Amino acid sequence: FYELEKSGKVRYFGVSNQNPGQVELLKTAVKEPLLFNQLQFGLKHTGMIDAGIHVNMSDEGSFVHDNGILEYSRINKMTIQAWSPFQYGFFEGVFVGNEKFPDLNKKLEFYAEKYNSTPTGIAVAWINRHPANIQTIIGTMTLSRIEEIAAASDIVLERAEWYDLYMAAGNILP
């Protein structure tokens, strides 16, 4: 890391899919700050926030699968970068426009119309609304898709709308 930074080849360092213990272990071997952690996150992959919403409950959402990486990242000023934000499951497909998720897509369409956006734009706005300032890795090189998603950066969903989408994605609130 030191040589990469010193030579100017890398300005900032981060990790991917690491929990707090793994980040701390890596920090014992490098001097450069770890500023980013790329994690799967989106409306159909909400585990990172579920445990915080379901504290002291006994339902599936209350189980901590990542050792509190969201809280750790916020405390340590590590930016989370959401990869595959439009996927459901582990690369099972895209949820936007998918007939398997009629309730979610109905809500995405509703808010897209309200905010003069697209369902994909609203899915990004949902991520952007989280107070952790999560960055979205959109994974496209198609200019029209980049423009549609970039336009969503101006959308600020109301808190009730954020939770409405969270529940439409199949999540419950305690």
Show which residues each predicted segment covers.
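Beta/alpha (TIM)-barrel catalytic core signal, keyed to glycine-rich beta->alpha loops juxtaposed to Asp/Glu
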Residues: 1-174
